From Swiss-Prot:
Homodimer. Belongs to the citrate synthase family. It holds the Pfam family Citrate_synt. This is Citrate synthase, mitochondrial.
Length: 464
């Protein structure tokens, strides 16, 4: 969508709108995702070729010294098609906001939350899928879900003190033995065919991830009990919750929502950028996604919802479960004055309440309005932003997605906080692998930015 926005500005909103409409309605009747991609890719290749020919030398931004030392925050440096993060309204998946996705994407029979299959279809094609297309995708993933025996054996032999994310990354790496792309590349496949094999690998990997994740959960927390068999009549999330051992229909609905909203968050975050970077070396999707999961395992990326729960639990321990607004306000100030942050508040890009927080809050208001932990989260929502504004340091005093997700999981009995990032990883596959397909389809080259030393920067600045 960033490219579409640029197109609208640079060669006319009318033309760009026509391109969007063409993409969204091409081959809309087919239920085969690969067939639709085969139709869309040449059109997008031609569009980008024309765009680059006309505007390849156009300057899109400036780079400052602070950006280079500050984690490249705000630096426009890569093309990422599947989602765009707006500071004021949050994430848009191929142009659609989270409320729009909740309303427009197909749902399970009797369900109210969007199916992640529909979100993946949207990310890959730019089209809102039909129920038939989503059903096809559910069945396709069920058909591809079986794990090779060596991966099962490896998971069963991991020590119980090995972190779930380490197990996930290792298992994904070992699945590389199944890579269609790696085999075809070794045999000399033409680069115009790369995307077809990447597509097959991405579909296989997404299909197998719930089995890997459920196997890890059962081995660590359920005495190694069987995950059971995939049911081709059920959707991806329902099969996942069944394999985890959860039978509550509300928990399955929560998982559909969770897997949808955590799927993608633009291309600059650690996991998305890592998969993009590693994939640019023509590493297969298994290796690229395993690298992304190693980034997600870092405490500054994927562990935030655990930190929120730890902080909430400590808060309850110190001031009690039924705390007044005044005492809560004092506790928040004590947290800030001790040099710590309030976990779950603030975001590197967002400047308003994260819509992913809002939709989880709405889920809680509907299904668990009287839960003590949710009531505490709701109470914090009223108080924390005002305290942070008074302090004057936070650019964004509003809650993010992590302020809520752990509380919902706890309510339905998933109390194993070390496992939460695995759920995040299963979800994130939808976004980064959708983009990986397009990266190869569009022929994106090896990523190789120029680095500079401090001495080099000083000389550069002095010369200006």
């Amino acid at each position: 969508m960033a490219l579409l926005t640029a197109a609208a500005r640079l060669f006319g909103a009318k033309n760009a709108s026509c391109l969007v409409l063409a993409a969204r309605h091409a081959s809309a009747s087919s239920t085969n995702l690969k067939d639709i991609l085969a139709d869309l890719i040449p059109k997008e290749q031609a569009r980008i070729k024309t765009f680059r020919q006309q505007h390849g030398n156009t300057v899109v931004g400036q780079i400052t010294v602070d950006m280079m030392y500050g984690g490249m925050r705000g630096m426009k440096g890569l093309v990422y098609e599947t989602s765009v993060l707006d500071p004021d309204e949050g994430i848009r998946f191929r142009g659609y906001s989270i409320p729009e996705c909740q309303k427009m994407l197909p749902k399970a029979k009797g369900g109210e939350e969007p199916l992640p299959e529909g979100l993946f279809w949207l990310l890959v094609t730019g089209q809102i899928p039909t129920e038939e297309q989503v059903s096809w995708l559910s069945k396709e993933w069920a058909k591809r879900a079986a794990l090779p025996s060596h991966v099962v054996t490896m998971l069963d032999n991991f020590p119980t003190n090995l972190h779930p994310m380490s197990q996930l990354s290792a298992a994904i790496t070992a699945l590389n033995s199944e890579s269609n792309f790696a085999r075809a590349y070794a045999e000399g496949i033409h680069r115009t065919k790369y995307w077809e094999l990447i597509y097959e690998d991405c579909m296989d990997l997404i299909a197998k991830l719930p089995c890997v994740a459920a196997k890890i959960y059962r081995n660590l927390y359920r005495e190694g009990s069987s995950i059971g068999a995939i049911d081709s009549k059920l959707d991806w999330s329902h099969n996942f919750t069944n394999m985890l051992g959860y039978t509550d229909a509300q928990f399955t609905e929560l998982m559909r929502l969770y897997l949808t909203i955590h799927s993608d968050h633009e291309g600059g975050n650690v996991s998305a950028h890592t998969s993009h970077l590693v994939g640019s070396a023509l590493s297969d999707p298994y290796l690229s996604f395993a690298a992304a999961m190693n980034g997600l395992a870092g405490p500054l990326h994927g562990l935030a919802n655990q930190e929120v729960l730890v902080w909430l639990t400590q808060l309850q321990k110190e001031v009690g479960k039924d705390v007044s607004d005044e005492k809560l306000r004092d506790y928040i100030w004590n947290t800030l004055n001790s040099g710590r942050v309030v976990p779950g508040y603030g975001h590197a890009v967002l400047r308003k309440t994260d819509p992913r927080y809002t939709c989880q809050r709405e889920f809680a208001l509907k299904h668990l309005p009287h839960d003590p932990m949710f009531k505490l989260v709701a109470q914090l929502y009223k108080i924390v932003p005002n305290v942070l504004l008074e302090q004057g340091k936070a650019k964004n005093p509003w809650p993010n997605v992590d302020a809520h997700s752990g509380v919902l999981l706890q309510y339905y009995g998933m109390t194993e906080m070390n496992y939460y990032t695995v759920l995040f990883g299963v979800s994130r596959a939808l976004g980064v692998l959708a983009q990986l397909i397009w990266s190869r389809a569009l022929g994106f080259p090896l990523e190789r930015p120029k680095s500079m030393s401090t001495d080099g920067l000083i000389k550069l600045v002095d010369s200006k």
